[in-house]
Amino acid sequence: MAVPPPAGSEPVIARPGVGQPALRPATSGDVSRLAGLLADAFINDPVYTWLLPGSLRLQPRLRAMFAAEMEQYVLPNRGTVWTTFGCDGAVAELPPGAWEMPKSFTGKEAFRWVRAFGMRSPLAMRVQRAMEERHLREPHFYVRTIGVRTARQGRGVGSALMQPTLQRADSAGLPTYIEASSERSAALYERLGFVHMGVLELPEGGPPVWPMLRPPAGSTHRAADG
């Protein structure tokens, strides 16, 4: 997550393409608002609704989890969170070598994680471990989370949010890795050049998750079906 620019300097702005929203790197002051929009974006996500079945407090639980991820995982690991100027969507990326979640985040001191998942925290931690075991090992950029406010979905915001990460990966000649938790998100990632790497079966009969990889532009890199 970026530090605000010094007074008098121009902010960093990404303009993905004609007709697409301009983006900016989020600051620590955006965390609460971005956690709220991500909670809204993932309110019907198959993985989260399975992890927290029938929860009447699903949205505040998700908000707490996303805030914790940004402040305890993405930010300390040299990550960047891109958002639109209206905070309609957000994407959290991690650079090569920084994708592993700190042990302190899922260990005994992870109070905010426990607050978010409650009695389901042990299962949530098993899901995280399963994803880490399957994670791409070669150097890559990792898109940890991407979400668009429900009222703004289907308008190209998600595609625009992905552009800074994909451009950085292409410049570095490295692939980009992401996990799709729904067929709809997998279809979006396919349109952006990602290919499937098999299916990840979650513990205790959880819904499928699709690891996906996008080779750098001009590369002959092919994803293995895992």
Features from the language model and the residues they span:
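A short beta-loop-alpha structural element at the N-terminal edge
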Residues: 22-36, 40
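Active-site rim helix/loop that mediates acceptor-substrate recognition in acyltransferases
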Residues: 55-79
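Conserved beta-hairpin
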Residues: 71, 75-93, 149
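Conserved acyl-donor/pantetheine-binding loop and adjacent beta-alpha core of acyl/acetyltransferases
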Residues: 87-147, 153, 203-204
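Conserved GNAT acetyl-CoA-binding A-motif
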Residues: 139-141, 168-181
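Conserved acetyl-CoA-binding loop-helix of GNAT-fold acetyltransferases
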Residues: 154-167, 191
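Conserved active-site alpha-helix within GNAT-family acetyltransferase domains
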Residues: 159, 171-172, 182-199, 205
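C-terminal "cap" of GNAT-fold acetyltransferases
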Residues: 174, 178-183, 202-226
